[in-house]
Amino acid sequence: MAGDRELFELSNGRCIMDEDLSDKMYIIKSYHPERADETSSGFEWSEMGMANLFGMLYNREARYCTEHKSWYTYFEGAWRRDEGAILVSEKIKDFVRLMILYCGEITDDDTRKAYTSFVNKMGDRRMRDRILKDATGELRISATDFDSNPYLINCLNGTYSLEDYSFREPRWDDFLTMQTRFRHTVRRDVKCTRWEQFIDEVTQGDK
């Protein structure tokens, strides 16, 4: 998602101040989900259609592991088990709020009224739960996909690769659940006196 474009400005002049939600609104508008036909997005006016749209918007931050029968969410550089689906439930609430705001961007009066009536049904928690259940197929992941690269060390501030000795920003698609408790430092002047003493002892000073 683009992080350098302007915040999404609604037709009423207000801006969506959260950058991530703003990016999602740009994507929603580009698909025009109210036009559910073969020439457009194809997102049906149904729970299944909303599950498809939710899955497309949140695939970088929410996944359902069938083996563990649990949702996982990505934050602070790692995928973490979402016990009780608390975080993913908040994400679908954000999704519903975005869809309600999007209804105000529909220019055709009749379509806007009809689509608003449909979207408002997602205010019912039972409907949101059913959408999440449908979305498990869209966001399915195998347990073997997690931590599958043994050469990646996930630190608090990024990911270190043992293959090329590089350090980079964390990536959601590394699917790392394990994370160290320390921050990686690239400083060359950091020394461990005890370690150097140990090396000197075992080599008897022959460096």
Model-flagged regions — what are they?
Residues 22-23, 27-28, 54-56, 92, ...:
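Generic hydrophobic, helix-prone segments enriched in Leu/Val/Ile
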Residues 37-53, 115-159:
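Extended, Lys/Arg-enriched charged tracts that mediate electrostatic binding to polyanionic substrates
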Residues 46-50, 88, 92, 131, ...:
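Alpha-helical structural motif
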Residues 80, 87-142:
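Histidine-centered catalytic micro-motifs used for acid/base chemistry in nuclease
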Residues 1-38, 68-101:
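Modules that initiate DNA replication and primer synthesis
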Residues 1-8, 58, 62-87, 112-113, ...:
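P-loop NTPase catalytic core of nucleic-acid-dependent motor ATPases
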